[in-house]
Amino acid sequence: MSLNTTTLSSLTLTVTSVYNKKRPLPPSFSLLTDLSSVHHHKTPRKNKQKQKEPAGSCCYCCSQNRNEILIKQRPSIFLASSTSGSHRFFNLSTENKASMDHYIAGTLIAAVFLLLFVVRRNDSKKPRKVSTTYKTQNDVFRSSVNAGKNGSPTDVIIVGAGVAGAALAHTLGKDGRRVHVLERDVTEPDRIVGELLQPGGYLKLVELGLEDCVEEIDAQQVLGYALFKDGKSTRLSYPLEKFHADVSGRSFYNGRFIQRMREKAASRPNVRLEQGTVTSLLEENGTIKGVQYKTKDGQELRAYAPLTIVCDGCFSNLRRSLCKPKVDVPSCFVGLVLENCQLPFANHGHVILADPSPILFYPISSTEVRCLVDVPGQKVPSISNGEMANYLKTMVAPQVPPELHEAFVSAVERGNIRTMPNRSMPADPQPTPGALLMGDAFNMRHPLTGGGMTVALSDIVVLRNLLKPLHDFNDAASLGRYLESFYTLRKPVASTINTLAGALYKVFSSSPDQARKEMRQACFDYLSLGGVFSTGPVALLSGLNPRPLSLVLHFFAVAIYGVGRLLLPFPSPKRMWIGARLISGASGIIFPIIKAEGVRQMFFPATIPAVYRAPPVED
């Protein structure tokens, strides 16, 4: 039964009288919110004699004089019961007046909190710029991080926009990830390395949809190598018969290539490229949460994302917290640009087995040829006082092929001489939730074979395939465990190219040791045999056949071939001794490199549990 208007008026008048007269509530009083579920108590009356109820009224309280009676009687609250349809009165007493005050105060507080919740909820739905102040021990940094082009947070922060960083940004952006790229200098870089992309690297470029980045930059096709030693030469062509005509190596200006990749990445609507120098990673409870960086205006900012990928190159200042860097600098490259000259073998890289170490020539445009002279050790002749020019003219120029001699001397006289240390660093990661290392910041090898970009692009393909099934990267711990498989899955390509680069550099460098001289000559003669003896090693070098076991077999085949040359036609004790040292020297070259790369990961990856880890389960 519902309450009518007259009854509600009675209820209001009754409660008002209680507060006006400061009348207390009875001990039996209880405030009930559901009027359909109450216990009924008889209301005590002054006259115990039953009063006659007027016709048409359900109870005495519904009579014409009920308002007057309610006022004259002790104050009470009228309740209705839907179950019985009868009305009863509950007397108010003095003990629990404070309880009612508490109920009213609690109701007001709850209403205020509800109002705040509704306002905050509606406000959070609006796209906005997040602006937060972070206090540190030394200063206060003002972070003004765009929450995404569509008001959404960032999925991935990429530190560095070189070959690895730019290619990764485009790849993840194409997969729908929201990417924030921070690059120290967005102008076109000017480097003397990273200018030759092997055919295996070009295939990865095609797989990532970036093959047009080698167009419109005057890039030159590279079809193989030419090897020179003591006036003799041999041509080693890439085994490209099974591939499309466009598949080959490419050589170009590194800066032009990188700028094309940056433009391609920045064209994605969900990729934001910003100029800024990252100074540190932001760590919280062992998990990387983002980066702290300085803008070109000098403002200190912070950016946050569930995954931070560091690709800041060979001079990385962030790698120490993510890996165990063991950087070796076996030599330096001295770079020159030769103009208006023709290479002995068109569209081929040229390797001269000079004394004391190799010299490289390869085209970087339709009119220019890059020359890289390897100088062993970390100390090179001074450029400023003319020592370098004198060294190049007197020591190097006589060993340059006659077709290039004049152009080489002219390049030295022009004086545009550059140097670059050649770094080697095996991949030795420290898996850290929320962060990953890639590119030269993670793994380097001697640039003699031009395999760095091939390894970087191959790593991006592996990482792309691992991340593709994931909806988001918010569970840093689960993501970190899952991505441990990356370090093993990358090994076939990376370890093959790394090991070959380190081994070839040591074999191609001259040495006073007779066994090393024999090994060097045996390598040149082995590759000159043609057939499988040349296509096998070249397929390894080009990234077309990344098989570590095949590399080891060819390497020791060269050593055995060298021993055979020593023992035939008539072996002698001296020759046998040199042969034994040749085998020992070959083992001393390749086994330390394999150990650094990881024997189990190179040859027995199926025995590593991380390879079989499934993607984290989405909630």
Segments (PLM) and residue ranges:
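Beta1/beta-strand and adjacent pyrophosphate-binding region of the FAD-binding site
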Residues: 145-164
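Feature marks short, highly hydrophobic, charge-poor N-terminal signal-anchor/signal peptide-like helices
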Residues: 93-106
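C-terminal helical "tail/cap" subdomain of flavin- and related membrane-associated enzymes
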Residues: 109-125, 409, 465-619
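Conserved N-terminal helical subregion
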Residues: 151-153, 203-206, 211-321, 327-335
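Glycine-rich FAD pyrophosphate-binding loop
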Residues: 157-159, 173-193
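Conserved FAD-binding catalytic core of PHBH/FMO-like flavoproteins
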Residues: 280, 286-287, 292-431
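Conserved Rossmann-like nucleotide-cofactor binding loop
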Residues: 164, 187, 279
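FAD/FMN-dependent oxidoreductases across multiple families
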Residues: 381-487
